[in-house]
């Protein structure tokens, strides 16, 4: 795609998000991301953004996909996370296996709602799922599944082959967990007793972890969108909120702080979207963007004062989502270990 095409894509995604996502952002937070909204995302090609066209997807390149994620996250990080799960976790695992490729068409059209059991591979956890294969049954429990309302899931079985399983039914929620952020997506524990499953490959945990590591630039894009959405609200609020007969923007601590954050946003974006990245550069983009999102959303919340904690102002969700997203999609210590291995050409930073 040419530069002009990327600009046109950004403009069209932003227009769609503002019209169809931002207008129901509070509803998404309160009631979750509806099937209707998912179909709306699919109608624009977002649910299959990285799925090849031969399997019903849009087949966007890396930069175009990042633009989609960033612009959706400006309005609803939950919507961006739903697209991320479909395109950067679920679909790559299916494509790599070469099996059940037909399901990708249903993912792209939002006929199928998907999830991947990846939370056990996050920092502070060390486990496979509790799913075992007994004959023609897959049985057990999956704890802390993001998008737990999915009808099709991928899990790594707790067996000698650590099989990667595609499970299309025979499971249900046994517990819905409270969540700090990404409230548009269900966060649940599932009980599985299914005969409707397929072994995609062996070494499932390793493959899921590799997919997580491959999301460096995508995670950076979502984090940038979260930061940009929060800062936009803070800048606009500082223009209209008066104190001592002056708008907040007239005061140096507010104006200087927001200006520096806006400038830093552009620096992080320029780096994340550069044409060529080394492996180390991708990790840096992820770490910097995630850290920036947490800092920027915190400052945006402070600019709003007490009003920032009211849901109707729409800024507190960005702070919550920045924190939740960093926990669910960024593994700081492991990311830094990967970076150190790239720099030192050997295992480093493990003591």
Model-derived segments and their meaning:
Residues 96-115:
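FAD-binding glycine-rich core of flavoenzymes that anchor FAD
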Residues 21, 80-100:
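N-terminal glycine-rich flavin-associated loop
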Residues 2, 68, 89, 304-351:
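Glycine-rich phosphate/cofactor-binding loops in nucleotide/flavin-utilizing enzymes
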Residues 21-32, 239, 243-246, 262-291, ...:
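C-terminal helix-coil-helix/basic helical segment that borders enzyme active sites and/or dimer interfaces
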Residues 1-84, 342-351:
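Amphipathic, small/basic residue-rich leader segments at the start of a protein or domain
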Residues 139-174:
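A short core secondary-structure module
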Residues 2-9, 173-266, 325:
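Glycine-rich beta->alpha junctions and the first turn(s) of the following alpha-helix
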Residues 109-122, 155:
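A short, Trp-centered hydrophobic/proline-enriched beta-strand micro-motif
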